[in-house]
From Swiss-Prot:
Record key words, sorted: ATP-binding, Cytoplasm, Glycolysis, Kinase, Nucleotide-binding, Transferase
EC number: 2.7.2.3
GO CC field: cytosol
The protein's enzyme class: transferase
Example of a GO MF term: ATP binding
Family in the record: Belongs to the phosphoglycerate kinase family.
One example of a Gene Ontology biological process annotation: gluconeogenesis
Reaction equation(s) it catalyzes: (2R)-3-phosphoglycerate + ATP = (2R)-3-phospho-glyceroyl phosphate + ADP
Protein name, UniProt field: Phosphoglycerate kinase
Pathway this chain belongs to: Carbohydrate degradation; glycolysis; pyruvate from D-glyceraldehyde 3-phosphate: step 2/5
Chain positions recorded as ATP binding sites: 211, 299, 330, 356-359
Binding site for substrate: 19-21, 38, 61-64, 124, 161
Compartment(s) of residence: Cytoplasm
Length: 400
């Protein structure tokens, strides 16, 4: 896989596919970025190209617009933050419409001097970006490619998507992987090749079905697989325990039984949970044994005994991969499981990887220093699919 050091970019236009998909708060007028982690992660690649006097054209998606412009998903606020981080102006090529690589983009790109940068409007405002129709994707890829002479893929959080800007544009331009993608791959290879032992994986999140592939892939490789979050209740049901009104995937119970039988004592479930009488921050709560959840109550976090037990396993591990919160951490009464696990992962002496997505958001929301972890991934879904052993379209396109 080529790197940007292999490209002769001085004086040339370089299209950089970054992942600037950040959360925005629209509640107080002008949109405000609430977590700029992905913007910051994109800077090293962009800066390296600017240092080589390239003309840099950054593109990204944000949110899930339906192939048409939606003002709330505009990348305009991201252009402002990117300019602050780079310390130079960022020319924004958005015109409020869906012609992402059209006249406005060509005008802005045409005015770039060496060492300057522009940002295109949200790629998903164009229906061709995510279209399942190969002709539509190819047509949009042609439009994007016409803006540049080189392509750099640096959107690790999107490499599992067969989207025009991710897997089609590299077929049309000399290309390389960006700094972020190479760093992410180095970390994931360390988790899959020969991880130092003991190797502990902590999985949370809502659904077993979302994590089934990675559970099956990791079970033979790990010394401990700790399961929390909403997905733990389907496992508890598989053991015959009542789960009240907790999140339950009934169709996955037999699968969970099989996984429990295969894993033996390597698959660790909570022994206590925090339950609530309703899904709300001000709900009545109680800590109960994991096999005694009352009828009508919802499990919304792992309990204090489970948090301590999970932390002990993590503290003794030489390699830790954590993906998914232990509870509804957005509500203070149900954040302690996630906080306890995050602090254990951060303070342990092992090689610690946070698998992106909600886990990375939790680290920042809970105020845990990011430098306390060996690596915080920018790609939740991409990380999981890589660990499953799947072929990721965006990586495959760069590796030719």
């Amino acid at each position: 896989m080529r790197t940007i050091d292999d490209l002769q970019v001085t004086g040339h236009r370089v299209l950089v596919r970054s992942d600037l998909n950040v959360p925005l708060d629209h509640s107080k007028g002008a949109p405000r970025i609430t977590d700029d982690g992905r913007v910051r992660a994109s800077v090293p690649t962009i800066q390296a190209l600017l240092d080589r006097n390239a003309k840099v054209i950054v593109c990204s998606h944000l949110g899930r617009p339906k192939g048409a412009p939606e003002e709330k998903y505009s990348l305009a606020p991201v252009a402002e933050r990117l300019a602050e981080l780079l310390g130079i102006p960022v020319a924004f090529a958005g015109d409020g419409g869906g012609d992402i690589a059209g006249d406005r983009a060509r005008e802005v790109v045409g005015q770039l001097a060496e060492g300057q940068v522009a940002l295109l409007e949200n790629l998903r405002f164009h229906p061709g970006e995510t279209s399942k129709d190969t002709v539509a994707r190819a047509t949009f890829a042609d439009e994007l490619s016409a803006l540049a002479e080189f392509y750099v893929g640096d959107a690790f959080g999107a490499v599992h998507r067969a989207h025009a800007s991710v897997s089609e544009v590299p077929k049309r331009l000399p290309h390389a992987a960006g700094r972020l993608v190479l760093t992410e791959l180095e970390v994931l290879r360390a988790l899959t090749a020969a991880p130092a032992r003991p190797y502990a994986v902590v999985l949370g999140g809502s659904k077993v079905s979302d994590k089934l592939g990675v559970i099956r892939a990791l079970l033979p490789k790990v010394d401990a697989l700790l399961v929390g979050g909403g997905m733990c209740f389907t496992f508890l049901a598989a053991l015959g325990h009542p789960v009240g009104a907790s999140l339950l995937e009934s169709e996955m119970i037999d699968t969970c039984k099989d996984l429990l039988a295969e894993a033996g004592d390597r698959l660790v479930l909570p022994t206590d949970v925090v339950v609530a009488d309703r899904f709300a921050a001000d709900a009545e709560t109680a800590v109960v044994a994991a096999d005694a959840i009352p009828d009508g109550w919802l499990g919304l976090d792992i309990g204090p005994a489970s948090t301590a037990a999970f932390a002990r396993v993590v503290a003794g591990a030489a390699t830790i991969f954590w993906n998914g919160p232990m509870g509804v951490f957005e509500f203070a009464p149900f954040a302690e499981g996630t906080r306890g696990v995050a602090e254990a992962v951060a303070s342990g002496g092992g090689f610690s990887v946070v698998g992106g997505g909600d886990s990375a958001a939790a680290v920042r929301i809970l105020g845990i220093p990011e430098d306390d972890f060996s690596h915080i991934s920018t790609g939740g879904g991409a990380s999981l699919e890589y660990l499953e052993g799947k072929t990721l379209p965006g990586l495959a396109a760069l590796d030719v």
